[in-house]
From Swiss-Prot:
It comes from the Bacteria. Keywords: Cell cycle, Cell division, GTP-binding, Magnesium, Metal-binding, Nucleotide-binding, Septation. HAMAP family: GTPase_EngB (MF_00321). Belongs to the TRAFAC class TrmE-Era-EngA-EngB-Septin-like GTPase superfamily. EngB GTPase family. GO terms for cellular component: cytosol. InterPro entries: G_ENGB_dom (IPR030393), GTP-bd (IPR006073), GTP-bd_ribosome_bio_YsxC (IPR019987), P-loop_NTPase (IPR027417). GTP binds at residues 31-38, 58-62, 83-86, 150-153, 181-183. The lineage of its organism: Bacteria, Pseudomonadati, Myxococcota, Myxococcia, Myxococcales. GO terms for molecular function: GTP binding; metal ion binding. This is Probable GTP-binding protein EngB.
Amino acid sequence: MIKVLDARFVTTAVEPKGYPTDHTAEVAFVGRSNVGKSSMINALTGRRKLVRVSNTPGRTRTLNFFDVDLERGGVRHQIRLADLPGYGFAKASKADKAQWEKMITTYLEKRHRLEAVVSIVDVEVGPTPDDLTTLDYLQAHNRRVLVVATKVDRLTKARLKPRLVELSKLMDLPLEVILPFSSTEKLGVDEVWGALLDTFGKSARV
């Protein structure tokens, strides 16, 4: 079992000079606007108000960093979470979209401390064209990607497995790399943390 010892806000940034300057291993959370990134981070950390949750799409317009202290099997880890602005917000102006895109791509391409990217997909909606483009982009830049199918509490158990199989085909990924998750029911919390620690846990030990 993985225990969250502490979780705290670190800083907000819009460009590299505002990024944290230490060597903590980072995980970025990406997904379309209003897919539930903030709710997922709150569920993972067990802190209901760590990240502000809004029903208004496009609310997150900066890179927001949070530090999480974890323990697994007596070994402590520290991971920094980076909450990125959502993509695909239809009501945003072209100028805002261009600014957000530059902010996100600069971080994803140049951040040396970025160990993995969690790509969040709505299990009912499925991968949007923006989701697929982002996945291709991350793979082209050799980023480790963990795909999380969120809001699975909206599906029955009988519908969930076939839907995950369908998602794996649509995204051209093995079924085992797509993790089901529910912020409402806290389903998949240990599995996501476990997958992240298995991927780069040694670099996150403290």
